[in-house]
């Protein structure tokens, strides 16, 4: 029999989340398991967006695609799941971010030892009374039941057989699979052992799952025993914390509740005094704050695609639930700081990445608050009409016009007991797609259709361009002037398919080669090369002679162009390596362009790269160039390449055998492009621009090799022209421009002051025109040729002269010759404000008559418009509206 808990072991059992995690890892480390660090939430697996299970990092090992790290391993793996996000905060145990404790055997121990250790850990280390435990087994797994009953000593009534849907694990329709056994905690053992229903979530919680991988399933569904059987287990850290800390749900454990308390403090509420709706919002904030912090830490940035969209959705849910609690100011950074403080012990990388995490939280919250304010206003108008549902058209308007996520509309509607017409939403989305198609510029698809037609019948082109730039090739297909053909003559635009080619076809960000196809009295100038289904299509024009199907031609790549493309491509690899070293190791490629004269690299990064960092990157790259690193290019299995540390672009599909381009000690990437043989061939590298191209995506543009000299020569010309213009030496230009800017600034201030004085002087004569309306002094006048600051000064001066009952409105054209710009200002005294009239609201409404708007403080405000012809009518309206308001008082 396996040892069970005693009262003393229960008293000394781990309690905190940190202790529970460490106890698990130590228990298995003492039993020969290698402690493995948590893998990133961004998995090295193109089939999933995020790490969703503790076994995912070991999946290649279980599938026989990768060498095992050790016969036995144990880990605490960070995981994210969002498939049931709507249940977060509403149930006791649903989360987006969670930690999965696991022990793994790769062809080492199997079922009996896994069961014995799981029981020993649960009862002996964690001190759980066996009376509180129930186990499940697969309905056909007699072996597991016997071990639980006869070896461990579990009461047979507390061993429950389950169907395949619950207790049989498979990696997919085919492949390794096997039965599993789960351990449940019973919160109500006093109810006895009869008619146990493990689906009763109020009574039972599953906390430890043991998977026995012992079969291989083929396409026919036949199960064959595996030669090497494996163990894959998972224990939910948050669930065990709930059990040992004796709290009603996972959220009230020390792993999450500090974040709930932080949110409650921000909202000024007491968690324990809130209703269920309020508690749910706090739980969502607590859960999601952990998730977004870990996602950003591992390199995810908010976007509208893939895992970036998951991050954005979680962030926006946090903000919205904060608003439901009355938090009307930005607070994500505060929650991020609280999450970092909570997570840093087990996950020190959050401290290393703190600046990046907080910057992304701040940026995305600011972006969403604008969206939320617009969308909530429109949605409130919709709900005010008390509809039976939110129509598809309304949901689409929120999405399309205001950037309001459909999921958020669904959540808000659900809170009001309403549904969203999803079919109508999809119909509106499809209508927009069709409108976009109809409005788009018509594209002549005849050429592409012709190319597709000839390519469909061709075998893959044999590419010889890594080793040779000249090759004798046979013409396999021709497209001439937009249609399939057997011949092409001088002057014809032509697309040529060859059996073998030295020309690189556009791909991987690199442009296709240029060159010629030559023969006896034949020249075909090739301007670009593309690929379609591994068939290379050479596009160009026949300059001399005639080309026919079956001809043998000499395919010659333009060597100068190829050299420049090679230099730029290798420089792009060096750029990514330098960015990882200088800016952030988590930087990942989002796209690239390798042209003959320039290169462009897009990468995931939440903030702009600073000028100092750009200088460091540039210096580092030129240092690697000067060090003359010889490149090593080889083909190897994809798993071997990744194990060696080769960088792959996420989302890119790779073959089983890949090409690895290695700059030893600097960079190693999977790449099918062409490269220099030594970094010294690049010559020079120069960054010319850094910018943002999308949310969380930065772009660096650069030149390399001879293009650097051309770039510097252009800059020299500009510097010389500036020097001549400002009569200054190159080193003096910056100071000279700065001095001129200061002079201009001072002149501008003096001019503004003079204009303000002039406006006040002009206004002085207007005070006598004020009209007494009851206890108020009303003055509405036009004053052209004065800017906004001048009009404000004049209005305020007049209001001061007229006293507390003053209401002054002045409108004018700052440039009397420009009818497209109107300025309106209002200045109200305290007596007017006390009568519930505010300058900001009033002048904003008047400005609408001039096609504009604006506002400001209750006592002084400015608005603008675009229709000067409407100004007289707007001033008349102001006079009438204020007169009526004053007489009504």
From Swiss-Prot:
SUPFAM superfamilies linked: Class II aaRS and biotin synthetases, Putative anticodon-binding domain of alanyl-tRNA synthetase (AlaRS), ThrRS/AlaRS common domain, Translation proteins
Record note on cofactor: Binds 1 zinc ion per subunit.
PROSITE patterns: AA_TRNA_LIGASE_II_ALA
One CC-aspect GO term: cytosol
Reactions it catalyzes: tRNA(Ala) + L-alanine + ATP = L-alanyl-tRNA(Ala) + AMP + diphosphate
Residues bound to Zn(2+): 569, 573, 671, 675
Keyword entries, A-Z: Aminoacyl-tRNA synthetase, ATP-binding, Cytoplasm, Ligase, Metal-binding, Nucleotide-binding, Protein biosynthesis, RNA-binding, tRNA-binding, Zinc
Domain of life: Bacteria
Cofactors required: Zn(2+)
InterPro entries: aa-tRNA-synth_II/BPL/LPL (IPR045864), Ala-tRNA-lgiase_IIc (IPR002318), Ala-tRNA-ligase_IIc_anticod-bd (IPR018162), Ala-tRNA-synth_IIc_core (IPR018165), Ala-tRNA-synth_IIc_N (IPR018164), Ala-tRNA_ligase (IPR050058), Ala_tRNA_ligase_euk/bac (IPR023033), DHHA1_dom (IPR003156)
Assigned EC number: 6.1.1.7
Gene Ontology biological process terms, A to Z: alanyl-tRNA aminoacylation
Compartments, as annotated in UniProt: Cytoplasm
GO molecular function: alanine-tRNA ligase activity; aminoacyl-tRNA deacylase activity; ATP binding; tRNA binding; zinc ion binding
Domain notes: Consists of three domains; the N-terminal catalytic domain, the editing domain and the C-terminal C-Ala domain. The editing domain removes incorrectly charged amino acids, while the C-Ala domain, along with tRNA(Ala), serves as a bridge to cooperatively bring together the editing and aminoacylation centers thus stimulating deacylation of misacylated tRNAs.
Function: Catalyzes the attachment of alanine to tRNA(Ala) in a two-step reaction: alanine is first activated by ATP to form Ala-AMP and then transferred to the acceptor end of tRNA(Ala). Also edits incorrectly charged Ser-tRNA(Ala) and Gly-tRNA(Ala) via its editing domain.
Family, per entry: Belongs to the class-II aminoacyl-tRNA synthetase family.
Protein name: Alanine--tRNA ligase
Organism, as annotated: Synechococcus sp. (strain CC9605)
